[in-house]
A protein has these predicted regions:
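Acidic beta-strand-to-loop metal/phosphate-binding motif
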Residues: 146-151
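Active-site-proximal, substrate-binding regions of enzyme catalytic domains
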Residues: 2-142, 153-195
């Protein structure tokens, strides 16, 4: 199976050595470590990475480079034109159009749902980009591609809507939290050892 990792699970659950270790395990189990180009962009220190996560983020990017050079990473291009970009754009239009509605955003600012800094820098527009990119890829082949994310799937400023659940229902995507994914990998390792 191809396991797409989301930004939150990479930053919160992985370090470089764990990433490389897992990729090595995948080699033995015929699973694939995968990311989207948008996830890799989200890992770059800057507006989207918290200051406290900047060093870890740099380290993860170095680990990703090792995986790329070792041919242990599959990267999906969502930013370029094609079916993944089309899927991504549809998801963003359908579920995140409210982030381009200035009246909606001003109300969120007044309620304290968006910080003044987010409003000023317009970083709120990019909320959940990584999750959307993973869904855009997974919906093309939901039996072979799963998403590993500890994000709950709630849409920014519309927490009653769960994006992961929407696409589980409509496109049969598979989403695993870190612990669930780790158990699956351990089962795969044990079954490979027995074979």
């Amino acid at each position: 199976m191809i396991y797409l990792k989301d930004t939150c699970v990479l930053i919160k659950k992985f370090d470089t050595s764990e990433m490389i270790r897992v990729a090595g395990i995948y080699k033995d189990t015929n699973d694939t470590f995968a990311l989207t180009d948008i996830i890799m962009d989200e890992l770059r220190p800057g507006k989207l990475v918290n200051q406290c996560d900047a060093e870890k983020s740099k380290s993860l990017l170095a680990g990703i480079k090792v995986l790329e050079n070792s041919h242990l990473l599959e990267t999906y291009s969502v930013k370029d034109s094609g079916k993944y970009k089309d899927n991504f754009d549809k998801i963003r239009r359908a579920f995140y159009g409210h982030l381009k509605d200035l009246n909606f955003v001003k109300q969120a600012l007044a309620k304290g749902e968006i910080t003044k800094e987010q409003f000023k820098n317009r970083t709120y527009i990019y909320k959940d980009y990584g999750e959307c990119s993973c869904i855009a890829v997974a919906m093309e082949n939901p039996t072979e591609i799963g998403i590993v994310s500890n994000d709950k799937g709630r849409i920014f400023l519309k927490p009653n809507i769960n994006l992961f659940n929407k696409y589980k229902e409509s496109d049969n995507i598979q989403v695993f939290d870190y612990e669930e994914w780790k158990k699956k990998i351990e089962i795969n390792i044990n079954s490979e050892k027995k074979a």
